[in-house]
Design a protein with these regions (language model features):
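Conserved alpha/beta-domain cores
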Residues: 2-131
Length: 131
């Protein structure tokens, strides 16, 4: 994430406000999905083994404000995903500034979907994976 710098990327840290109720709602939903994933991981009837890596839940923030991502980040969620480069880039910028204010590590971002050649240079500035 440290590469997310430059004239078009530097932003003032905004106060990404959210209510405790909204944070709890988001975290409950996240935990519910994660519990279902962990329960499904226990089913070894497929190709998964005890040595298989755990499944990583990518929290997609499409159509949701950066403040929701901040609430989840403050609750311990560290992996977010987007399929729109401009929206992802803006949220990544906001969260980098938010994390710098708090002296915490910024989250990892995944770009989801077809990566067009003209967007590749932009996406690699914030995303650590493409799916």
């Amino acid at each position: 994430m440290s590469e997310l710098k430059g004239p078009d990327v530097n932003v003032e840290a905004q106060d990404l406000k959210y209510t405790p109720e909204r944070a709890e709602q988001l975290l409950q939903n996240y935990r519910r999905v994660l519990e279902r994933i962990r329960a499904a991981e226990q089913d070894r009837s497929g190709v998964r083994t005890e040595q298989s890596a755990p499944v990583h839940l990518v929290t997609v923030t499409k159509f949701f404000p950066a403040s929701d991502a901040a609430a989840l980040l403050d609750g311990g969620v560290t992996l977010f995903g987007e399929n729109r480069d401009q929206e992802a880039r803006a949220k990544a910028r906001e969260l980098v500034a938010y994390c710098e204010q708090r002296a915490v590590q910024p989250p990892h971002w995944a770009f989801i979907g077809q990566l067009q050649t003209n967007k590749a240079k932009s996406v690699v500035k914030y995303a650590s994976s493409v799916h």
